[in-house]
Every structure is written in structure tokens, then in C-alpha cells.
Amino acid sequence: MKFLLDTHILIWFFSGDEQLIQRARAVIADESNEIYYSLTSVLEIEIKHTAHPDRLSIDGERFLNHCQRLGFIQVPIKTEHILSIRNLVRKENAPPHRDPFDRLMLCQAIVEDMKFMTHDERIAEYVTDAVYKV
């Protein structure tokens, strides 16, 4: 199965953070799965690290190096991914989800027929079977 990992999932995995549950670690470690990261995550990390290096110690380059060293596959940003954001539908009465990085990565997963692994409750409120909530 193909899994696109949300940025925080990757950070937790790289740092050994216990917030990443065993089920998620097992999916990532399972060699029958293809593990992907988005170029969107590299952008998100670089923007957030540059703005607040005291809150996010990893920069985009180190993040990218970790992904490549582990053999994760990069998902580039395509026009189709961007334009499909308009088609995202929230569940009834779900509060707004304003994170543009998350929305773009969810669209990448949908367009590329992947599961989007996340811990974010707001992402799980989209009407799609692409979300793999951990």
C-alpha cells in the first residue's frame, strides 16, 4: 500500500517521539508498503524553521536528507494537486481547517491514490477514504 506521511508524522518518526503510535511505526517499517513524503512538507518545514528555529530545530535540508536516507519517495507538487483543493468537502458541522499545507498533501494523496497518514483530527473531518488517522 502507498502511504503519504503528514509532516508531523515524519518529524515524530525521525525523532523517535512517543506520540507516534506503534501502529504507525509498523506501517512505516513494513517493507511491503511504499512510504512517500511530499515536497510540501519540505516547504512547510523550511518556512516554520526559518520563522521559529527555537520551536522547530530541523530545517528543510536535514528533513529532506532524512527522507532520502530512509528511501522514502518524494511526491512533487503538481498543478492537478493544487487545483483539486477546491474539491475537498468537510463533514457536516466540521469546523474549518485552515492549514494549506495539510490540504495540499491530502489532495496529493487523493490524486495519487495513496493513504494520507496523519494524527490531525481536522484532516480526518474531510469526506474521503484517503485519510489514515493514527
What do these predicted ranges mean?
Residues M1-S38, P53-N65, E121, E125:
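Short, well-structured N-terminal submotif of metal-dependent ribonuclease cores
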Residues D6, E44, D102, D120:
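Acidic active-site catalytic centers that drive phospho-/nucleotidyl reactions
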Residues T7-H8, I45, I85, A109:
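Generic structural signal for small/hydrophobic residues in well-ordered secondary structure
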Residues G16-D17, K48-A51, L88, D129-A130:
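Residue-level signal for well-ordered alpha-helical positions
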Residues Y36, V75, Y132:
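General small-molecule cofactor/ligand-binding pocket signal
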Residues S57, R69-H119:
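Active-site neighborhoods of divalent-metal-dependent phosphate/nucleic-acid chemistry enzymes
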Residues V111, K115-M117, E121-V134:
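Charged phosphate-binding loop/patch that engages nucleotide di/tri-phosphates or the phosphate backbone
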